[in-house]
Amino acid sequence: MFKVIDTHTHFDAEEFDEDRAEAFARAKEAGVGKVFLPAIDVKTTHAVLALAKEYPGYAYPMIGLHPEEVKADWKEQLAELRKILEEHRMTGNACQAGSPQFSDLIAIGEVGLDYYWSREFEHEQLEAFEEQVKWSVETQLPLMIHCRKAQNEMVHLLRKYEKELPGGVFHCFTGNQKEAEELLSFDKFVLGVGGVSTFKSSHLREDLPAVVPLDRIVLETDSPYMAPVPYRGKRNESAFVVEVMKTLAKAYGISEEEFARQTNLNAERVFPLSVSQV
């Protein structure tokens, strides 16, 4: 059976506290070969690192401060995250020239800008995002980017570092064709597409094949949020990424196996891992 990768799932969320092990088992049974775990602050960074140790070779952690978590203490949060980042950097013989600097962390994320609910910490969000973009440049870990109601500001900031960045994912893409084309102008980045693509009202099934090449998409759930049809309204989980894959394969007019294969290759290109291990 072919496998798929869920490139964005919050398995550390409290919604999984009652059945986390069972949810992992369901993901594996459904054909999910790997799960990538974004962090949103210091606490969740520790949590996803712990899950990666519990599920080695299956769960892969990230590190970052989510824009909605940028509050009055954001500088202290970033300082603590920077300390964790340094603790996980390989040194000496373990770090060979041209090889990844980290044995476990696969991305800086979930980071970005979010002006949807409030612009109270707008300036602080920009500062925190830019600092973490610099971490990506320095470490060459890709970015997992969250952006709502701030694409212009995000694009402006990323242009400053475009040539130095290793790439990344524009997570939870739900925009139109013009917005997709603007994001794809960052040629080392891909679009993360999830459950919204399965909604009856979604335009993504038409817009994505029109302007987004197959080699510029990765699959995600963003669980426990935004469950795909036929689970809409319920708690989302990684096993449901298969529904996203089926929907998009049909939209692109190719087999589910070919769509899974290509999106796995895309994940391998962006993140420091080998698809041969999936």
Regions found by a protein language model. Name each.
Residues 1-278:
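Mid-domain alpha/beta scaffold segments of enzyme catalytic cores
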